[in-house]
Amino acid sequence: MAKYLFVYHGGKPPAHPADTKAVMDAWGAWFGSMGAAVIDGGNPVGPSSTVRSDGSLVDGGGANPASGYSLIEATSLADAHKKAAGCPLLKAGGTIEIAQAMDM
């Protein structure tokens, strides 16, 4: 099977701190539904910056900064799309960028 990088963008944090557990439970259930296909559940990420080819730095991560990542195994890009469809981030208004990770 191939490896796919899921890069999460956007999404809204829970409106109330009490809702955090429900959000984390939803992520746990989604990862659980994929079983061994989850190679690395990843992490949320903090503020980012971009290094340009001239060496200059731009804060803010560009037009669509990443909010987290995971590494998933799937049989094809279509299978990766199906796996991504259950992600709780999508219900929170976020998006998922999917790219095949090439073995070197």
Report each predicted region and the residues it spans.
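Conserved, structured core segments of small domains
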Residues: 1-104
